Every structure is written in structure tokens, then in C-alpha cells.
Regions:
Chain A
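Bacterial N-terminal signal peptides that target proteins for export
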Residues: 2-12
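Detector for intrinsically disordered, low-structure N-terminal pre-sequences
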Residues: 14, 26, 149-151
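N-terminal signal peptide c-region/cleavage motif recognized by signal peptidases
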Residues: 21-23
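N-terminal small/polar-rich segments of proteins
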Residues: 26-142, 161-206
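Short, surface-exposed beta-strand/strand-loop-strand elements in extracellular ectodomains
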Residues: 138-155
Length: 206, 198
């Protein structure tokens, strides 16, 4: 019976061991278990562009300085009937005034008159400027100012169409640009307001 | 020693005790318990309506101005552009995004009512852009074009999924700020999830 007792003790120890093992496993599992993993997240942003522009702008040209140009001495022959002959003032002989516009056009550069911002696939935008039909003349009655050669620029490049940076939607990341255009005063004979010139800016995501 | 059992009965008792010890031992994670973390979460595309615009192209007219011009064509002094607000917001939300779930086997005594008393959670989230920056999603082709992203954990909710299964859901709210995004298209990031159960 001693053997049997001892045998029982051994078996009981085994039972305790098994019980202990089971409890220990449960504690290990139940005490603190940590699992980790990752989930990839994808968000999709739409294309969007904002063009800021002036709907109207007025250029006030400075008043040319009035001048009296002394063309020098001249002697003319005058008949008794009152007819004078000799040197006369002509286009070729007129002295230059401070302002001369013959054969030239005035290129007007207006910085920061448009701005763009938004999102595009490439992060860029195309900005184009055109003169619509009838928009190439500023008129005051018969007096006209011709408008031509209009360009957009962004401080780095200039042209009728440019590819420029589209820096995002925030105002602080907007791209600013200017306009250049030529004005022809050769058919201008009136002072005062000449109206009717137009340009159209188009901004597109690319 | 009259009361001593025969060896065969002793063996049966041992087996019974072993089974009893297993049943009585506290169980927190059975083999039937399954944690599932979703590998990919494709969020609904951000719409123009969410930004507060009706069209993908907006023209914003500025107040007219007058400027002095010189005859020699020098740069005209134009006023500083005061840009109007052209959209409503740059903040976008995606709520109740399901990232993971835990299935518990009801055979271990779990019920919808007691699952929280038996399983306490601590869940940590970390969102990292493809460019490696934390709290960002980055554009697929331009690492400098980013969406600022913040994640907010929602309380774990459990429901009975079937007769033998209780499912607990790990959902989050995602808040995005697109003011630093430059490009349209897809932005990528990874959410690291660490779930600790007590």
C-alpha cells in the first residue's frame, strides 16, 4: 500500500503539475497579449483650379511734358503777292521731343494681375491669354489705341501660353503672374478715356 | 487503506482532474479567437462638394484697379492681390473606418455583455505617409505633396455574429487637411495598429 500511496503521490504531483501548467498558460495568454498589424490607406484628391483675375483695370498714362522746341533760324523768300518759299518744317526735319512714339509701340508690363491655385495631376497648370474678337482696340470716338502681342508671365517665363506651377489650394501657395501687352498710339488723337480693350486668361489643370 | 481506489479508477480520477483543471482555468484567448486587420482601406474619394465648390474650375474676379502707366513701358505698379476665398474648407473627415475586428468564440463563455469585462483593450494607432512622415499621407509621385492626417480611436463595439461567434470592431475617425497637398490623385499611407488585450 505504501507503493500505492507513493504512486498516488506521484500521480497527484502530476495532477498539480498539469493544473499548474494549464494555469500558467492561461496567465500568459490572459495577462497581456499584444498583436500588431498595418493597414494601407488610400485617399483620392480631385482636380481643382481657381483663377483670380481683375475684371477691369484702368491705365492712366502720364501726361507728356509740354514742350516748345526751337527749330532754329529759317529764312524764306516771300513774293510781293505773299507767297513764301524756302525751308519748311517737315516730318524729317522735326526735332525730337521728350516723348517720341513713331514706329514704336509701348509695351506695358503689369505684374501680379492674376493668380492660380489648386490641384492637378502633374502639379502644374497651363495659363493662356488671348484677345477676343474686337478686343484689340481701345477707342474714344475716332481716336484709337491698338492692343496686340498680349502675353502672360510668371516671373520666369513669358508667352501667349505658359506652363506654370500649381502649388496647392492655399492662398499662401498660389502662383502669381503678370500680363504684357503692346499699345499702339499711332492713331490716337484724343486725350481722355479709351475703352474696349479685352484680354481673356484661361487656366487649365494639366 | 480501504478507501483507496484501484489503479484503473485512480487513472480515471487523474484524467477527470486534468479535464476539470483545464475547464476551470481562466481562458482569454482560445484558438477559435481570431484577430483580423484589414490590409487595405481605400477611402471614398474627396469630392469637390466636400471642399465647398460646385465645379472643378473657379474664376474669382477681383476688384477693378487703376494704375499709373509710363510711356516707356516700365512695369506698372499694381496693387497687391487680395485673393478671395474660393472654397469652403480644407478639412475632410472619413468616419467609422473599420480597421480590424476580433472574433471571440462563445464556447469560452464570451457573451456580448461580458466580453469587455473579460477582454480589456489598449489600441495604439500610428499613421505614416509613404514618404515616411508621421501623420501624413503622401502623393504617389511627389513626396512633398501631402495630406495631413490624424486618427481618432472610436470605442470598440461588439455584436453577436453567429451562434458561436462574437465580433468586436475596431473603428477610427480619420481627419485630413489638404492645405499642403499640391496634386490631385491618390495619396498613400500606412496605419500601424498595436492591439494589447489584458
Amino acid at each position: 500500500m505504501l507503493f500505492k500511496r507513493c504512486n498516488l503521490r506521484v500521480i497527484c504531483s502530476l495532477i498539480l503539475l498539469l493544473s499548474f501548467s494549464g494555469t500558467a498558460l492561461a496567465v500568459a495568454e490572459g495577462g497581456k497579449e499584444s498583436s500588431s498589424g498595418t493597414a494601407k490607406v488610400t485617399a483620392n484628391v480631385p482636380q481643382f483650379i481657381v483663377l483670380h483675375y481683375y475684371s477691369s483695370l484702368t491705365l492712366n498714362f502720364e501726361t507728356p511734358t509740354s514742350e516748345a522746341l526751337d527749330e532754329g533760324d529759317n529764312s524764306m523768300s516771300v513774293s510781293w503777292e505773299g507767297k513764301a518759299t524756302g525751308d519748311q518744317l517737315s516730318t524729317a526735319s522735326l526735332m525730337d521731343a521728350k516723348l517720341e512714339l513713331d514706329g514704336t509701340k509701348t509695351t506695358v508690363k503689369m505684374p501680379n494681375v492674376w493668380a492660380i491655385r489648386g490641384f492637378s495631376k502633374s502639379g502644374n497648370a497651363e495659363v493662356t491669354v488671348t484677345i477676343p474678337s474686337g478686343g484689340d482696340v481701345l477707342a474714344n470716338g475716332e481716336s484709337k489705341i491698338g492692343m496686340s502681342n498680349v502675353k502672360v508671365n510668371d516671373g520666369k517665363q513669358s508667352g501667349s501660353s505658359i506652363k506654370t506651377n500649381l502649388g496647392g489650394i492655399a492662398k499662401s501657395s498660389a502662383t502669381f503672374g503678370g500680363i504684357e501687352l503692346d499699345l499702339d498710339f499711332s492713331k490716337t488723337n484724343r486725350s481722355g478715356s479709351h475703352a474696349g480693350g479685352q484680354y481673356t486668361i484661361t487656366a487649365s489643370t494639366i | 487503506m480501504k478507501g483507496l481506489l484501484s489503479p484503473a479508477k485512480q487513472g480515471l480520477l487523474v484524467l477527470s482532474l486534468c479535464i476539470l483543471s483545464t475547464v476551470l482555468a481562466p481562458e482569454f484567448a482560445f484558438t477559435g479567437d481570431v484577430l483580423k486587420i484589414y490590409k487595405n482601406r481605400k477611402l471614398d474619394a474627396i469630392s469637390l462638394r466636400e471642399i465647398g465648390v460646385a465645379d472643378s474650375g473657379v474664376s474669382s474676379s477681383l476688384n477693378p484697379f487703376e494704375a499709373s502707366a509710363s510711356w516707356d513701358g516700365n512695369n506698372i505698379e499694381t496693387p497687391e492681390l487680395q485673393l478671395d476665398d474660393a472654397y469652403g474648407t480644407t478639412r475632410i473627415s472619413r468616419n467609422d473606418v473599420l480597421l480590424w475586428y476580433y472574433d471571440y468564440d462563445t464556447s469560452s463563455g464570451n457573451t456580448v455583455d461580458n466580453v469587455f469585462s473579460r477582454h480589456a483593450y489598449d489600441v495604439q494607432y500610428r499613421i505614416i505617409g509613404r514618404n515616411g512622415e508621421e501623420n501624413r499621407l503622401s502623393h504617389k509621385r511627389d513626396n512633398t505633396s501631402v495630406i495631413v492626417a490624424h486618427i481618432t480611436e472610436k470605442p470598440v463595439e461588439c455584436e453577436k455574429k453567429s451562434k458561436r461567434k462574437i465580433r468586436c470592431f475596431g473603428r477610427v475617425d480619420l481627419d485630413f487637411d489638404i492645405s499642403q497637398a499640391k496634386r490631385s490623385g491618390k495619396y498613400y499611407g500606412t496605419i500601424e495598429i498595436t492591439i494589447t488585450t489584458f
